[in-house]
């Protein structure tokens, strides 16, 4: 058969994508499509294999920095920026799926909304979701990055954004990079402090969710709110 089917070979992932769809391609082939070309020493698929091996698969690759990518022989600034832009677009698309009038009715809803974004983070991120009177997410904000400590989490930073967004309530989240979402004493102290401040100013802190690896803990369900 003449035409595009005649040129579909192992080294031509773009042609396979056109014929069979993106879903039929392996991770190495999809990465090769983004990279477009290899180097003088290796094909684009071999370069894809090297990148995936360097980052131990997609889990670490999705958070790769420019410096980490260009340290790999065959990956220049142009290829690295293409990959970083593609990964960021993917994150934003996933986020849009949930941001469109996403309502939070339970701790499970909240954990589902943020799990994939937070469970792989290598540092603790303290994030607040700001809700309207219908419990719909109207804004989210990363308040700080680092170990959770009551002397670091300033209520004014948490509630300042609530006033700016005219939020009716707040849900706080942070991740445990260890994968174990069991709350620490500091987690509980920070939560109680924020809840008390919320009572005083009239913006309820509905929950504090701790994200682990496919696991979460609700401090409200644990009786700390």
Swiss-Prot record:
Q: What name does this protein carry?
A: UPF0758 protein BCE_4545
Chain positions of motif JAMM motif = 174-187
Q: Report the Gene3D superfamilies cross-referenced here.
A: Cytidine Deaminase, domain 2
InterPro entries per UniProt: MPN, RadC_JAB, RuvA_2-like, UPF0758, UPF0758_CS, UPF0758_N
Any idea which UniProt keywords this protein has? Hydrolase, Metal-binding, Metalloprotease, Protease, Zinc
Give the GO terms filed under biological process for this record.
Answer: proteolysis
What sequence ranges are listed for the domain MPN?
103-225
Record-annotated residues binding Zn(2+)? 174, 176, 187
Q: Does the keyword Zinc apply?
A: yes
Is Protease included in the keywords of this UniProt record?
yes
Species name: Bacillus cereus (strain ATCC 10987 / NRS 248)
